């Protein structure tokens, strides 16, 4: 552990944020507890991440989680890779499909659209960024500009998280660690520096405050206004 996280008792102003996070992920990430040392930073991050990751958009939620995994894997952040793969499973992506991510170019588990998105995420995670006109042209065969913009927002958010968690060697929580050990070790995943036995998040799961329940209810029912597009037949698009 490189920086001691804030305790939830000393971050009461984020009770609603933590409750929403628990409802979505099943736990409060140690990365957020470390971020809570700077309340203004966590407040801004929580709002942005809810907008990009939780709010329903025009991309399939499972595909979002898969590209989160791929950009994290490409950037070398094992913490975020474990989180993203675990989130994909929570969003009903089959575990055998997650296990096939290391061979997504050849695997029959993935559609051509998914391969294009994963290829794009893989290139975006490299330093320097390896996204070129070829990757964009391939994306446009399957996604419209608004869907691509949503995808880039996800990748940009993960760029911040990859560097945050890799630089801090954030200890990986039990849930995503167990999932990664079961399903990602075959494609090269290792906990490495994120394996810390100090219980940073020992708090029992708390009941969700009414305000947080209302926020989640609104998020799950919000849909952007549909726009006429030749891509509206794609499963990730809003009907």
Task: Give residue spans per PLM region.
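Hydrophobic alpha-helical segments
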Residues: 1-239
């Amino acid at each position: 552990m490189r920086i001691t996280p804030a305790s939830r008792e000393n971050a009461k102003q984020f009770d609603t944020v933590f409750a929403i996070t628990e409802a979505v992920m099943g736990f409060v990430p140690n990365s957020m507890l470390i971020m809570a040392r700077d309340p203004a930073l966590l407040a801004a991050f929580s709002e942005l991440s809810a907008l990009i990751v939780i709010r329903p958009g025009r991309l399939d939620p499972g595909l979002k989680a898969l590209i989160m995994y791929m950009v994290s894997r490409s950037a070398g952040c094992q913490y975020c890779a474990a989180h993203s793969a675990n989130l994909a499973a929570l969003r009903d992506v089959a575990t055998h499909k997650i296990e096939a991510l290391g061979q997504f170019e050849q695997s029959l588990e993935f559609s051509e659209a998914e391969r294009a998105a994963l290829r794009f995420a893989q290139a975006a995670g490299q330093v320097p960024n390896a996204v070129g006109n070829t990757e964009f042209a391939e994306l446009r065969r399957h996604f419209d500009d608004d869907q691509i913009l949503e995808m880039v927002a996800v990748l940009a958010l993960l760029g911040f998280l990859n560097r945050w968690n890799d630089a801090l060697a954030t200890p990986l929580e039990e849930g995503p660690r167990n999932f990664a050990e079961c399903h990602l070790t075959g494609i090269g995943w290792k906990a490495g520096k994120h394996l810390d036995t100090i219980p940073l998040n020992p708090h029992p799961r708390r009941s969700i405050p009414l305000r947080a329940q209302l926020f989640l209810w609104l998020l799950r029912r919000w849909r952007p206004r549909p726009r006429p597009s030749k891509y509206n037949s794609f499963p990730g698009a809003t009907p």
